[in-house]
Amino acid sequence: MNSGGGGGLPPPSAAASPSSSSLAAAVAVAVAASSGVGGVPGGPAAAAGVKLKYCRYYAKDKTCFYGEECQFLHEDPAAGAAPGLGLHSNSVPLALAAAAGAAFPPGALPGGGAGPPAGPKKPELGVPGAATAGGGLDGPRVAIPGMDGGALTDASLTESYFSTSFIGVNGFGSPVETKYPLMQRMTSSSSSPSLLNDSAKPYTGHDLLTSSASSLFNDFGALNISQRRKPRKYRLGMLEERLVPMGSQARKAKNPLGCLADRCESGVPVSMVWWDRVPENNLQTPNPTASEFIPKGGSTSRLSNVSQSNMSAFSQVFSHPSMGSPATAGLAPGMSLSAGSSPLHSPKITPHTSPAPRRRSHTPNPASFMVPPSASTPANNPAPQPPSSGQVIQKETVGGTTYFYTDTTPAPLTGMVFPNYHIYPPTAPHVAYMQPKANAPSFFMADELRQELINRHLITMAQIDQADMPAVPTEVDSYHSLFPLEPLPPPNRIQKSSNFGYITSCYKAVNSKDDLPYCLRRIHGFRLVNTKCMVLVDMWKKIQHSNIVTLREVFTTKAFAEPSLVFAYDFHAGGETMMSRHFNDPNSDAYFTKRKWGQHDGPLPRQHAGLLPESLIWAYIVQLSSALRTIHTAGLACRVMDPTKILITSKTRLRVNCVGVFDVLTFDNSQNNNPLALMAQYQQADLISLGKVVLALACNSLAGIQRENLQKAMELVTINYSSDLKNLILYLLTDQNRMRSVNDIMPMIGARFYTQLDAAQMRNDVIEEDLAKEVQNGRLFRLLAKLGTINERPEFQKDPTWSETGDRYLLKLFRDHLFHQVTEAGAPWIDLSHIISCLNKLDAGVPEKISLISRDEKSVLVVTYSDLKRCFENTFQELIAAANGQL
């Protein structure tokens, strides 16, 4: 990017948009500060005290980073240009001179400005020897890596990998990058999670939105159009650099807070970016370590589709503590610790140098929908000022950096008009066009999803009659309310589990420690003689994956009248095994049992054979391989990849169940020294088991995985499915001489992985839309609950007429207006939209007037919803005070 020098305006490419303009301005300021140029080439022949040109920053934003020390004229060029002064044209961008010693002759300054040459450069704004540096239009241009669409020095540093762009710290990146200070890149709300952590002091100032009168249902949990805003922390000084030492000239500047840039065309500030201060290179201070570049707390600016916050974010640049160590400085130019792992390094999940998980999973900041107080400032207001003493609530100094907490009470945004009461938006178009049913409800969630959730709730709350099932104990260890999830085996049962070799049973139980439901897998008659296997159990407890049922606890008990070993897992209500979903049909094996293999011309086509769709099989493959990849990465083996131990919830969601059972049941005393000695063999067996499961799904029958039917089963797969599925099954079932990995099947999955990801995200969109329909229902219920506590109360404070007088009488008439409307013929008028609309207007307190007619129709009261809201609030607060004993 070419940065214009002097008082020139930004080049056309940089002035195209507010964001690009601010970025170009910031690069010019930062490069000029680090090179000591100061924005205009100066030489020894320049006269002191003469400002040759207009300052382009002051001309654009009425503010400048350098304050009074700026070597350009701080006047409005529109008011009239002084003789000999001029502004560069946008169409003639100037190159940033990088060659030292190239001086300008008198009267030949860039841009055609004429006048006495400037005097020597002030030493505090540059490095020694920079006063004589200059450059011409033909001088070499300095390219900023990664700016204006330029290629990044490290190809692995994509914009999606970091929320901020960083340039050269302690040997990070190429040698050119180390010459520039860190620059904050403006990020949108979708890529900038809030960084306001627990270390920040809570803001205790008065917030109108959290007061008791903010909403009628506030006592039950307020919900308004303008949601509450989190406190922001404004950092004094540089973005990523320590404060300038006391006594330096830069600290004595009039505006020590830096340049506030980025205004939109209309003059309304859309963002305020705090650019880096001039580095004190002349002080020869040591280069700070990476830990000093990490803010101790802060918040990010979040831009909504309606408005943008006018304070930028203080994002963390580095997350790993070792990035600032001397070891990183020894990297070769161009090397980066941030590159992701290659497939050869799999199955590592995330490189240790990636951004911290807290940044990726932090709760979204509700401040993104708020309008800051300064948004209501008129457009002709002069330069924005730093937080004044009246605005600052409190401040904190951490590691030499001062943070200010300011009042964040929202103010209306100029030019924006919002509805004055809650309005239900239509269905999102990307969801409306994918609706499978034309008669889907508009104001409530889909019936299918509702029924599924109700079934889950019923199963979770199910209990047994202890008199009918006395064999089930009332309490096992710290679990109670046991409910069998499978038919209990008879007392004299001799048949053992085909998987574990022991009689097993499964229960739902509630843990008395946290009151959460869990699934208990009981191993009958097992005595745990070696507790060293608990090392493997502890490793299983640490695994959290969306396709694995997490193991929580393993304990022994005699509550079942015999020694038993119990595994406690997360409970997923409504789940069924793959065996019962796909292989429980008695006709599924008809293709293999009714006729001999080889007595027909070939397998029947898929639609006649009743086979599963290939897309469903690939969805299962992606989930099962993902679970295996996580397990193998942790150094463990699944060992239960079987249709009877794979749970299916919803439609296609898989979870591997009963993990860790084999590690305890088959633990050998010879493994005392190394419990993980045989894991490599078990992992290879997992791949074979995965191949059998996939082949059974492709044949839609367990008979296809039998050894005598294996060849014909592969012929069935070859005719009815793609070659990729056939190759995957052959790879998993074929015993090879080398060690295989679950990552080897990724090329066979190929682009189908993105198909499954797209389907999952579309499903998420549909569920979010259903959730959005239910957002307002809870609020309206709270309003009705509060209204019901007021209306028709027989007595209050020994006054039997309390509900029929004063404000309560208005609320009684409003209740009749809400629910007891009749038609001209006297028939009941039932209209849900009327009820919802009136409740929303009451909650918002709109100035609309309504007529309330008494029951005898002798009086008509004309009131506004704002009057009714005031009556509602006062009356309910009176009830609350009486309930708390304050009356």
Swiss-Prot record:
One of its GO terms (molecular function) is zinc ion binding. One of its GO terms (biological process) is protein targeting. GO terms for cellular component: nucleus; P-body; PAN complex. InterPro entries: Kinase-like_dom_sf, PAN3, Pan3_PK, Prot_kinase_dom, Znf_CCCH, Znf_CCCH_sf. Keywords: ATP-binding, Coiled coil, Cytoplasm, Metal-binding, mRNA processing, Nucleotide-binding, Nucleus, Phosphoprotein, Zinc, Zinc-finger. Pfam families: Pan3_PK. Residues 147-498 are annotated as: Necessary and sufficient for interaction with PABPC1 but not needed for interaction with PAN2. A zinc finger (C3H1-type) spans 49-77. ATP binds at R521, D570, F571, H572, A573, G574, G575, E576, T577, T644, K645. Residues 281-290, 298-307 have a biased composition (Polar residues). It is found in: Cytoplasm, P-body. A motif (PABPC-interacting motif-2 (PAM-2)) lies at residues 284-299. The modification Phosphoserine is found at S354, S361. Residues 789-887 are annotated as: Knob domain. Residues 111-139, 280-307, 321-393 are annotated as: Disordered. It comes from the Eukaryota. Homodimer. Forms a heterotrimer with a catalytic subunit PAN2 to form the poly(A)-nuclease (PAN) deadenylation complex. Interacts (via PAM-2 motif) with poly(A)-binding protein PABPC1 (via PABC domain), conferring substrate specificity of the enzyme complex. Interacts with the GW182 family proteins TNRC6A, TNRC6B and TNRC6C. Interacts with YTHDF3. PANTHER family: DEADENYLATION COMPLEX SUBUNIT PAN3, PAN2-PAN3 DEADENYLATION COMPLEX SUBUNIT PAN3. Regulatory subunit of the poly(A)-nuclease (PAN) deadenylation complex, one of two cytoplasmic mRNA deadenylases involved in general and miRNA-mediated mRNA turnover. PAN specifically shortens poly(A) tails of RNA and the activity is stimulated by poly(A)-binding protein (PABP). PAN deadenylation is followed by rapid degradation of the shortened mRNA tails by the CCR4-NOT complex. Belongs to the protein kinase superfamily. PAN3 family. This is PAN2-PAN3 deadenylation complex subunit Pan3. It comes from Mus musculus (Mouse). The lineage of its organism: Eukaryota, Metazoa, Chordata, Craniata, Vertebrata. The gene is Pan3.
